[in-house]
Curated annotation (Swiss-Prot):
Disulphide bridges, residue numbers: none
One Pfam family, short name: Trm112p
The organism's place on the tree of life at top rank: Bacteria
Protein's organism: Paracidovorax citrulli (strain AAC00-1)
Protein known as: UPF0434 protein Aave_2563
GO CC annotation terms, alphabetical: cytosol
Taxonomic lineage of the native organism: Bacteria, Pseudomonadati, Pseudomonadota, Betaproteobacteria, Burkholderiales
Amino acid sequence: MDPKLLELLVCPVTKGPLTYDRERDELVSRSARLAYPVRDGIPVLLETEARPLTDAELEA
């Protein structure tokens, strides 16, 4: 994930920052407790496509 692109992207739900999880290829919004997929290098920032984060994932 390009760091400059990551600086520009925000969570569509909270408008908060996103972090990149390289292992799962997801953009994570801790405030919304959601992980957005990155498919073929393209972030899919749709709430309907995001998966909810568990408490364990948020603590990691």
